């Protein structure tokens, strides 16, 4: 009984910590919270708690025979923690991002220890070998691919001795992921428009960012071409059907967030007005109001906390890509603020179902500059 009481107390205090450092909305426009060292520390501790935690673990692993029955650590010596491979990847990304922003944070030494222990050349070689299995062709496509490239992008842009070593070590895995993009997406005739991991628009979005950051013209051309082919003629998005019960992306908004990267600045507002004609009026209502989460211990229902966070970053960036006098801009900015507060309040719920991944979405929201 005493141990259970202690665990509940720790979870409650962790939840209060996150909530206490998020500004409450004002009576008028709600300012989107900004990152500071206290928030960074709270988010980092959530990731540090999970990245070395091998179990519980949800493997995406195809067995070709008895010899393929292995532990998560044996299969994925870098990305074995945080419940699943992709959550481990974006947990690593989050720690790198926070360390870059707050190099003197109290958790910095522990963060460097964890990253240095995981991102070794030997460990990455094993991850590359896993991708080389015939059965692993569709492994983590495209959600995990996208986050792996985001991690590589973060490391590549960091002028730090450790960061340079880790970037070099990770490069072979980033290269094989890029090759998977170049091989697969020309064959995918139709986009996947779901609000979860297979979403095509999200997969292309982070690939576009990576391609631009490293000067990979082939990858950028591929994303531009496929985005236009998949989404260029879209109109009247059925956004009133959103959200689905386990979404962590809005199919409508994540598509628009991709297209504001791909289309020239003069074309995007016209495309958006055709695609989401009710945006200036905050319609449809179900898209512009935060989703309701009824059970944060359920690994599917808690996805909706992530939806609120990803909607916020999409709305903010979409709004910033519009002219100052565009009538949709204000509605999107207000909705982004509402979604930010709704999502950030529940990053630390006390349950691993959300805590193993939501902090990464929160950090992406709070540390990624809106489009200009």
Residue ranges and their predicted role:
Residues 212-353:
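Long, repeat-rich segments with strong aromatic
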Residues 1-6:
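N-terminal secretory signal peptides that target proteins for export/translocation
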Residues 31-37, 73-89, 129-146, 187-200, ...:
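Solvent-exposed loop and edge beta-strand segments that line ligand/cofactor-binding
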Residues 30-80:
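Low-complexity, Ser/Thr/Pro/Gly-enriched N-terminal "stalk/linker" regions
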Residues 31-35, 45, 49, 89-105, ...:
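Well-ordered alpha-helical scaffold segments within catalytic/enzyme domains
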Residues 18-31:
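Bacterial Sec-dependent signal peptides at the C-terminal "C-region" and cleavage site
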């Amino acid at each position: 009984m005493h141990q259970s009481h202690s665990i509940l107390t720790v979870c409650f205090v962790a939840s209060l910590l996150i909530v206490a450092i998020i500004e409450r909305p004002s009576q008028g426009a709600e300012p989107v919270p900004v990152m500071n060292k206290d928030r960074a520390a709270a988010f980092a501790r959530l990731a540090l708690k999970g990245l070395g935690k091998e179990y519980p673990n949800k493997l995406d692993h195809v067995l070709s025979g008895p010899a393929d029955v292995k532990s998560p650590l044996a299969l994925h010596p870098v990305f074995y923690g945080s419940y699943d491979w992709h959550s481990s990847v974006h947990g690593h990304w989050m720690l790198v991002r926070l360390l870059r922003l707050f190099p003197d944070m109290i958790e910095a030494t522990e963060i460097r220890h964890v990253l240095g222990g995981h991102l070794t050349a030997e460990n990455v070689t094993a991850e590359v070998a896993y991708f080389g299995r015939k059965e692993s062709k569709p492994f983590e496509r495209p959600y995990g691919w996208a986050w792996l490239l985001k991690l590589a992008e973060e490391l590549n842009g960091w002028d730090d001795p450790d960061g340079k070593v880790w970037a070099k070590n990770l490069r072979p895995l980033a290269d094989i992921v890029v090759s998977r993009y170049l091989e697969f997406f020309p064959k995918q005739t139709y986009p996947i428009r779901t609000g979860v991991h297979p979403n095509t628009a999200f997969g292309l979005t982070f690939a576009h960012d990576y391609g631009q950051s490293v000067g990979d013209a082939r990858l950028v051309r591929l994303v531009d071409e496929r985005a236009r082919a998949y989404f260029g003629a879209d109109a009247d998005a059925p956004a009133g059907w959103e959200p689905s019960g386990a979404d962590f992306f809005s199919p409508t908004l994540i598509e628009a967030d991709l297209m504001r990267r791909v289309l020239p600045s003069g074309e995007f507002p016209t495309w958006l007005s055709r695609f989401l004609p009710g945006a200036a009026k905050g319609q449809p209502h179900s898209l512009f109001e935060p989703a309701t989460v009824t059970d944060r211990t359920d690994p599917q229902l808690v996805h909706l906390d992530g939806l609120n966070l990803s909607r916020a970053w999409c709305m903010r960036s979409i709004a910033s890509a519009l002219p100052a006098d565009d009538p949709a801009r204000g509605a999107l900015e207000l909705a982004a603020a509402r979604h930010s507060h709704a999502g950030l309040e529940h990053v630390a719920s006390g349950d691993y179902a959300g805590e193993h991944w939501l902090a990464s979405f929160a950090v992406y929201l709070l540390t990624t500059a809106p489009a200009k």
